[in-house]
Amino acid sequence: MRCMRIVVLAGITAAASTAALALPAQAGIPTRDGRTAAECEYPADVLDLTDWKLTLPTGEDEDPTDITQPDLATFAAKPWFQADEDCGAVQFRAPVDGVTTGGSSYPRAELREMTDDGEDEASWSTTEGTHTLVVKEAFTALPNDKPHLVGAQIHGGDDDVTVFRLEGSKLYITDGDDTHHHLVTDDYELGTEFEAKFVARNGKIDAYYNGERETTISSDDDSNYFKAGAYTQANCENSDPCDGDNYGEVHISGIKVTHS
């Protein structure tokens, strides 16, 4: 028998269940396999979120809601974080009027890499070992006026190291503050799924798009971690209307991290 409870967080109501589903692997990336919509009640039924933490665009000023394990395994928060209707992906949505962290002026519905089944925050060096993130995702909505959105990134101790960033129809891979470091494509269409991949090793980060290496950047940071989701690069000062109907959105159908 399932035990159901209702969780209310910063104006969001989400159903939580003690039941959990085993997650199969498809094409090397943990994702769903033939489930119906009724079987993916939570995003964790679609993606393996064992070693992740979620930050939502809700909560108190400069103190957004964080969801950690084990709660994340049975958590959803429509429309910011939910399994899509066909159980094929997880929707991440961050509105321009969303709550931001103290270190950013932009809202996010985003996963942050963790370790030890979600107990501790991940932190690794680009000069020791090999660290890989593979994400299958699609940008599905952009904010008005400033249509900029980040879908995956490596973050360092103080700031982002490199990200996949969409500006209108132009998809870039960044290098620190150089937001236009490398143009991947200038005709990206919303809803188009692609594979983003970062491989960090030997003080370098290789960035791949659909299996092809696009660029390599140098980095010797020793406190890195992966992030993925919707990190909207707009707010109420530069995007109108200032409400929840103006947002950035990303759908993720597969995500995998490896360290060696």
Predicted regions and their residues:
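Short tryptophan-centered beta-strand motifs in secreted/extracellular beta-sheet-rich domains
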Residues: 133-135, 191-207
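Short strand-turn-strand beta-turns centered on an Asx-Gly dipeptide
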Residues: 208-212
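Ligand-recognition surfaces built from glycine- and aromatic
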Residues: 38-59, 128-132, 144, 219-260
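Secretory targeting and sorting signals
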Residues: 1-28
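Secretory/extracellular carbohydrate-interaction modules
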Residues: 71-170
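Short hydrophobic/aromatic-rich beta-strand segments that constitute the beta-sheet cores
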Residues: 92, 173-175, 207
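N-terminal module-boundary/linker segments of secreted carbohydrate-active enzymes
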Residues: 28-78
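Short, aromatic/His-centered strand-loop micro-motif at the edge of beta-sheets
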Residues: 172-195
